[in-house]
UniProtKB/Swiss-Prot annotation:
MF terms (GO), sorted A to Z: 3' overhang single-stranded DNA endodeoxyribonuclease activity; damaged DNA binding; promoter-specific chromatin binding; single-stranded DNA binding; TFIID-class transcription factor complex binding
One Gene Ontology CC term in the entry: nucleus
Species the sequence originates in: Mus musculus (Mouse)
Record's compositionally biased regions (Polar residues): 87-99
Gene3D superfamilies for this protein: 3.40.50.10130, 5' to 3' exonuclease, C-terminal subdomain
Motif (Nuclear localization signal): 17-23
Protein's UniProt name: DNA excision repair protein ERCC-1
Basic and acidic residues: compositionally biased ranges: 1-10
UniProt lineage: Eukaryota, Metazoa, Chordata, Craniata, Vertebrata
Protein's cellular compartments: Nucleus
Length: 298
């Protein structure tokens, strides 16, 4: 009997040939690390440790405190990510130049817009309520609305992030006792690194928005104090900081003693002899000139 013929005469199974399954047991310490794709599938399903769900902070203070410190691997949200359902192409990016105030559609119907008359404004898909310049924006908040929805401003500040260099929180004070609410908002602005501006009416709030936009390209010289460069003006400014010493007294002292060195070393009697100065002004000036810079504890 030929064994080869017997094998040929056997009925062959229909369909593709079945594959043998090899089971490779793994010890507990040989479980592949997370993120590494194993070469073989284990017969046992290793238990994956459950990760604790990240709880979103409820206030801006918690949000600011829980952020990672600055470093090579630290990631800090900037607030530039578009919100859910928001088209990124419709969002005005920081640095985009515009001659108008860009108003968020969420401010539609705000009475403040009726008083923005001196500068143009238009609606646009932006993260803040008002974009006042290339690096300036504003969030509007009514204290009456804040008392009803205290979490609203926390969420807005989180979404805004650090998108703009100057971030203004424009608050309309429309309640009778605003002290406690303003105290909380002031702390929040310190944490958020934004400027708190108070307005007692919608008209005043509109003027603030107009002013920020109108002075967008103006230098800061208008806000800075003009300092005189000549010696007489600067010496007069220094001496008039003493209580009850005016510009006339300052000019008399400089004309009498000739220099600040002679004035500083003069006695109380010499100061009192100056015309128009008197003993009381002389005593105050002498005490200021001879007061130590550092207070010595007694």
């Amino acid at each position: 009997m030929d064994p080869g013929k017997d094998e040929e005469s056997r009925p062959q199974p229909s369909g593709p040939p079945t594959r043998r399954k090899f089971v490779i047991p793994l010890e507990e310490e040989e479980v592949p690390c997370a993120g590494v794709k194993p070469l073989f599938r284990s017969s046992r399903n290793p238990t994956i440790p459950a990760t604790s769900a990240h709880v979103a902070p409820q206030t801006y203070a918690e949000y600011a405190i829980t952020q990672p410190p600055g470093g090579a691997g630290a990631t800090v949200p900037t607030g530039s990510e578009p919100a859910a359902g928001e088209n990124p192409s419709q969002t005005l990016k920081t640095g985009a130049k515009s001659n108008s105030i860009i108003v968020s559609p969420r401010q539609r119907g705000n009475p403040v817009l009726k008083f923005v008359r001196n500068v143009p404004w238009e609606f646009g898909e932006v993260i803040p309520d008002y974009v006042l310049g290339q690096s300036t924006c504003a969030l509007f908040l009514s204290l009456r609305y804040h008392n009803l929805h205290p979490d609203y401003i926390h969420e807005r500040l989180q979404s805004l992030g650090k998108n703009f260099a100057l971030r203004v929180l424009l608050v309309q004070v429309d309640v009778k006792d605003p002290q406690q609410a303003l105290k909380e908002l002031a702390k929040m602005c310190i944490l958020a690194d934004c400027t708190l501006v108070l307005a007692w009416s919608a008209e005043e709030a509109g003027r603030y928005l107009e002013t920020y936009k109108a002075y967008e390209q103006k230098p800061a010289d208008l806000l800075m104090e003009k300092l005189e460069q000549n010696f007489l003006s600067r010496a007069t400014e220094c001496l008039t900081t003493v209580k009850s010493v005016n510009k006339t007294d300052s000019q008399t002292l400089l004309a009498t003693f000739g220099s600040l060195e002679q004035l500083f070393t003069a006695s109380r009697e010499d100061l009192a002899l100056c015309p128009g100065l008197g003993p009381q002004k002389a005593r105050r000036l002498f005490e200021v000139l001879h007061e130590p810079f550092l207070k010595v504890p007694r």
